[in-house]
Structures are given as C-alpha cells and as structure tokens.
C-alpha cells in the first residue's frame, strides 16, 4: 500500500514474492464502547494475536460506531483522520459498510448488514437458524414472541435474522407488530424500560435476544421480579459466549465456529499486505442449540407472570 500524498487515494501495488512485506497498522472499529461485548468475543483476542504474530500492529479505534451515532458523515470524518492501513468494522450498518466499500483504505466487514455490498466480509449464517429457532418456539405453543435487536437490524427494514423471524411468525398465522420487533433506546436504562413495558400487562411467552450481554441482563431482570425461566418465559440468545458454559439451566442459543472467520481475516490481511485485491464474502455455518432456557408456552388458563404479579400466588 503506497501513499500518494495527503488527500489522495492510497495505491495498492502487488509486491513481488521475493520482497519482504511490511507490517500493517490495522484498526478495529467496534460497534459499541462497552468492554464486556469484546470480552464475550474471545475470537477477537485470538485474531489480534495471529495478526501481531505475523508482524502487524492492531488497535481499537478511539471511538465506536455507536459513539459516532452510526452516522456516516461523522464516521467518515473520524476514519479519515485515523492513521490505518486496513480497517476491520465490527457489526456495521448497511450505510456505514457501503461507505467503507468505497473508501480508499482496504476494509473488512466482520458481521453487519453487508449483503449486496462489494466489501470483503465474514460472519455466521444466522437467518436460517433464527428461522429454525422461531419454528421450534411456535411448535412449543408460543404465540407471543418478542425479538430484541439493535436498531440497525430492524431499521429502515428488518435485517436477515429479524426478517426470518417475522416470516416464520407470519407463516404460522400469528399477527405481527411492534410487540414482536420493538423499538428501544440502546442503553441500560432503555433495555430495562423495554422489559418493564413488555411485562406490564400481557407479557411475551418467549424472548429472542441479540447478544450475550443482553441475555444475562434479561435473566437478572426477570430473576429480581420473580419471573421464572422457562416456566413463565423462554429465552433464546442469537449468539454464543464462553459464559454460557457456566449457566444452569443451559442456554438456548445460536452457536457457530469462529475459527474459520479468524482464518479468513488473517488471509485477507495477508492479501492486502501483498497488494492483492480481495473482496470475497464468506458465511460460516451456524446451528441452534436447544438449551434449558426454553420450554412449552404457559397454558392458556395459566396467566403469565407480570412485573406486578405476586410471586407467591401466580404462575402455577
């Protein structure tokens, strides 16, 4: 990668095989500033280790996508003033990834709404598995199912997993609306407010959550209010985390092998370092793990417990 002066695009030139490659400065652009989200993604640590072993320098950018409001203009200004030879964008929105696909510095989409965008990418193929998990819940008698996902996965139109979820609900003849895919403020306070509103009157019998930290937060919320899992409500997480191995009952979740994703990014960086254009997109197989956090929907004559219910008298 050769610089051509300030304000001019960098030139990608393929290096001869006998020429030693220089290490690249690789920036990771997180979707959130929350440290425990990266803690759940142990494969990021493995990826950084592999890249640094290969002689590259890796770092997390000072700002996250959410801190920049997932706003293309703000992100563009931030990125262009950050010195990096390659960018790895974690869970970017469609407009953000579209901008990176046209940016002069090589960029890689790790997850995110990348479908139809000419950008190198990798991630698990979750939509079919999300559909399977939804069908399983419906087969267990669940009619009131809520999926909690980030704004980029529900707006301006539902993303792959949310779309698969809504399709299965429609196929089952269940009417859908904001109860199934609610809008919410993406913060601790917003998450609690959403759960309180869901359980105030006619609560869901099953909740599908986007990320592991949300799953744990939901479990804590429900436990402190006497709402039992899975007797009163079933929970499914659309991701996996090392912490799930310590959970009893076992967590119903979507599992995928991160090793192919790590290998793909290492190969991409190697190609970038050699000056080879690489915009290949790969999907990793995912599968639904039926854990102990899901069960049959509460019987029609047995009222779901709400946050106003008395734990000593309801939900038998």
Where on the chain are the PLM-derived regions?
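N-terminal helix-turn-helix DNA-binding module of bacterial transcription factors
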Residues: 1-20, 306-316
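Amphipathic helical "hinge" segments at domain boundaries
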Residues: 8-76, 85, 163
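Periplasmic-binding protein-like
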Residues: 27-29, 79-91, 146-149, 201-214, ...
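Short beta-strand elements in bilobed, periplasmic/extracellular small-molecule ligand-binding domains
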Residues: 51-67, 147, 162, 166-191
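Flexible loop/hinge segments that line or gate small-molecule binding clefts
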Residues: 90-129, 213, 239-251
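Hydrophobic alpha-helical segments within soluble ligand-binding/sensing domains
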Residues: 118-148, 188-196, 215, 255-274
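An alpha-beta-alpha
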Residues: 133-176, 280-294
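Flexible loop/turn connectors
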Residues: 195-315
């Amino acid at each position: 990668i050769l610089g051509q002066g300030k304000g001019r695009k960098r030139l990608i030139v393929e290096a001869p095989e006998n020429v030693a490659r220089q290490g690249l400065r690789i920036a990771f652009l997180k979707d959130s500033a929350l440290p425990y989200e990266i803690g759940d993604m142990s494969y990021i640590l493995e990826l950084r280790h592999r890249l640094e072993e290969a002689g590259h320098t890796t770092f997390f950018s000072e700002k996250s996508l959410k801190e920049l409001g997932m706003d293309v203009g703000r992100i563009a200004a931030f990125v262009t003033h950050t010195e990096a030879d390659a960018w790895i964008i974690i869970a970017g929105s469609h407009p953000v990834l579209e901008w990176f696909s046209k940016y002069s510095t090589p960029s890689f989409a790790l997850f995110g709404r990348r479908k139809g965008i000419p950008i190198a990418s990798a991630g698990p193929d979750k939509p079919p598995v999300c559909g399977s998990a939804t069908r399983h819940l419906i087969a267990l008698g669940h009619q009131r199912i809520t999926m909690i996902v980030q704004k980029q996965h529900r707006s301006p139109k539902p993303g792959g997993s949310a779309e698969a979820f809504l399709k299965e609900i429609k196929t089952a003849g269940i009417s859908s609306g904001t109860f199934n895919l609610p809008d919410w403020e993406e913060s601790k306070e917003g998450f609690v407010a959403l759960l309180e509103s869901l359980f105030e009157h006619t609560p869901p019998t099953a909740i599908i959550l986007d990320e592991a930290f949300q799953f744990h937060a939901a479990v804590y919320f429900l436990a402190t209010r006497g709402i039992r899992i899975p007797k009163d409500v079933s929970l499914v997480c659309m991701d996996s985390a090392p912490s799930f191995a310590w959970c009893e009952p076992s967590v119903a979740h979507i599992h995928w092998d991160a090793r192919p994703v790590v290998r793909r990014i290492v190969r991409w960086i190697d190609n970038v370092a050699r000056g080879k254009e690489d915009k290949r997109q790969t999907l990793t197989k995912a599968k639904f793990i039926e854990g102990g956090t899901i069960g049959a929907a509460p019987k029609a004559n047995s009222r779901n417990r709400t946050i106003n219910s008395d734990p000593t008298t309801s939900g038998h």
